[in-house]
């Protein structure tokens, strides 16, 4: 079974979403990120590639750079550029490219599912890249970027997504690369509970993109569990940020939402 949970997302207000949105951290280098964020203090690159706030050539793996990430993450929240929802939700993220729109459910995926092999991998990972993202997760106490999972098509989940996306989206914009980004908040408690039940009937999830981010999030969550003498299993660190797409809708790309992982009790 696939264990998921809703969560209180940390996300930009509508007025700021286009300025905050960025490409994934690993599809561009530091100088490219610096150029894309030029003149935009709200760009998420200041958190996911914080070396852009230092002189060119700064080692992106230095302690000062990781520290800058959390300083910027905190500052974004203090200034209201990222705001945490006041209740737990699932969300729907959709992307339009080349005339095709694909829809994914944004969920908290279970660390234990990854450790047990219920979340399936198809790539080997490098320890140095895992450790880089682990440091980023540790210092921010959050998953700043999601991973992408695929799940076997499910007609009831399809129906829920269709119903929820029949209303105007919370976010709806076209990025400079021409991709459309659309986002809905699932607010109905019965719908949220039913989504959880339906995923519990799915034997496995499959990593579509983000093997290193998945490994890092799961390893840090497992680490926090070992360090917590009062660990129960329902703390936020037991889950990490994932967008789950029906297998028939892949391939995918994404925008940003944050799942906090600092809860201990």
Task: Annotate each language-model stretch with its function.
Residues 1-162:
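N-terminal extension/subdomain marker
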Residues 110, 151-153, 209, 218, ...:
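Short, structured patches in soluble enzyme cores that scaffold and shape functional sites
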Residues 115-116, 158-160, 215-217, 251-254:
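Short helix/loop capping segments that flank catalytic or ligand/cofactor-binding pockets
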Residues 171-189:
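A short, charged helix-loop
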Residues 184-229, 235-237:
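Active-site beta-strand/loop microenvironment that shapes enzyme catalytic pockets
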Residues 242-254:
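Short, conserved secondary-structure transition motifs
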Residues 255-261:
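Conserved small/polar residues in nucleotide/adenosyl-binding loops
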């Amino acid at each position: 079974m696939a264990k998921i949970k809703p969560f209180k997302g940390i996300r930009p207000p509508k007025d700021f979403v286009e300025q905050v949105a960025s490409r994934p951290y690993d599809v561009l280098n530091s100088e490219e990120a610096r150029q894309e964020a030029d003149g935009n203090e709200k760009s998420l690159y200041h958190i996911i590639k914080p070396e852009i706030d230092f002189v060119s050539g700064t080692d992106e793996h230095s302690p000062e750079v990781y520290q800058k990430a959390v300083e910027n993450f905190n500052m974004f929240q203090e200034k209201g550029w990222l705001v945490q929802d006041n209740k737990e939700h699932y969300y729907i993220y959709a992307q339009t490219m080349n005339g095709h729109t694909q829809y994914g459910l944004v969920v908290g995926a279970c660390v234990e599912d990854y450790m047990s092999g219920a979340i399936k991998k198809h790539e080997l990972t490098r320890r140095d890249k895992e450790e880089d993202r682990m440091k980023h997760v540790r210092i921010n106490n959050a998953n700043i970027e999601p991973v992408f999972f695929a799940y076997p098509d499910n007609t009831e989940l399809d129906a829920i997504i269709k119903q929820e996306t029949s209303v105007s989206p919370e976010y709806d914009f076209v990025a400079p690369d021409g991709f459309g980004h659309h986002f809905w908040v699932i607010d109905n408690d019965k719908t949220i509970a039913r989504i959880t039940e339906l995923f519990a009937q799915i034997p496995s999830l499959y990593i579509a993109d983000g093997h290193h981010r998945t490994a890092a999030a799961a390893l840090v969550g497992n680490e926090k569990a070992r360090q917590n003498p009062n660990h129960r299993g329902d703390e936020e660190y037991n889950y990490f940020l994932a967008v789950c797409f029906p297998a028939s809708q892949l391939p995918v790309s994404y925008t940003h939402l944050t799942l906090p992982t600092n809860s201990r009790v």
